């Protein structure tokens, strides 16, 4: 009797690396055809999200590698820090402008995040409220029968 492969069983680590590498490779190809500049890593994140949502890629096929990468994310930011050090000449020319830009962009990010969160909360509370209202109406209709 043949054993069927369990779909919920996590894939081997090497298989997970290959899946993520293929997604990144496809995103690099997509990046080369895009009319606007967009990092392949961002395209890859969106592509992987779509693949996970559609079920084309199962969570078990990327979970272990994703967790490992997330746990070591500080190490992955070292190249970005080194490139900032290489740009100290540019930063030293207009430090107040750069600090101001950082402050303004942080405030705008917080405001936008707050508004988006409020919109999502309103939409989800309406849908939950509609379900509760329908349930109450059904119970009232059954009580009158």
Curated annotation (Swiss-Prot):
Gene Ontology annotations for the cellular component aspect, listed alphabetically: plasma membrane
The UniProt record lists the keyword Transmembrane helix: yes
Transmembrane residue ranges: 10-30, 33-53, 72-92, 96-116
Major localisation: membrane
Keywords carried by this UniProt record: Cell membrane, Cytolysis, Membrane, Transmembrane, Transmembrane helix
Compartments reported by the entry: Cell membrane
Topology term for the membrane: Multi-pass membrane protein
InterPro entries with a match to the protein in the record: Antiholin-like_LrgA (IPR023736), LrgA/CidA (IPR005538)
GO BP terms: cytolysis; killing of cells of another organism; programmed cell death
Residues making up the signal peptide according to the UniProt record: none
Family, similarity comment: Belongs to the CidA/LrgA family. LrgA subfamily.
Function statement: Inhibits the expression or activity of extracellular murein hydrolases by interacting, possibly with LrgB, with the holin-like proteins CidA and/or CidB. The LrgAB and CidAB proteins may affect the proton motive force of the membrane. May be involved in programmed cell death (PCD), possibly triggering PCD in response to antibiotics and environmental stresses.
HAMAP family according to UniProt: LrgA
Name under which the protein is recorded: Antiholin-like protein LrgA
Species in which this protein is naturally found: Staphylococcus aureus (strain Mu3 / ATCC 700698)
């Amino acid at each position: 009797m043949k054993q069927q492969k369990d779909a919920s069983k996590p894939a081997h680590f090497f298989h997970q690396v290959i899946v993520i590498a293929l997604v990144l490779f496809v995103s690099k190809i997509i990046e080369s055809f895009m009319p606007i500049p967009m990092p392949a890593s961002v395209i890859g994140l969106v592509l992987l999200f779509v693949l996970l949502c559609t079920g084309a890629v199962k969570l078990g096929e990327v979970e272990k590698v994703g967790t490992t990468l997330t746990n070591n994310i500080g190490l992955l930011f070292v190249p970005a820090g080194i490139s900032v050090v290489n740009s100290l000449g540019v930063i030293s020319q207009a430090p107040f402008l750069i600090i101001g830009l950082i402050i303004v962009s942080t405030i705008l990010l917080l405001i936008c995040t707050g508004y988006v969160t409020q919109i999502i909360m309103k939409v989800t509370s309406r849908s939950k409220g509609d379900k509760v209202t329908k349930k109450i109406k059904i119970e009232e209709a059954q009580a009158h029968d």
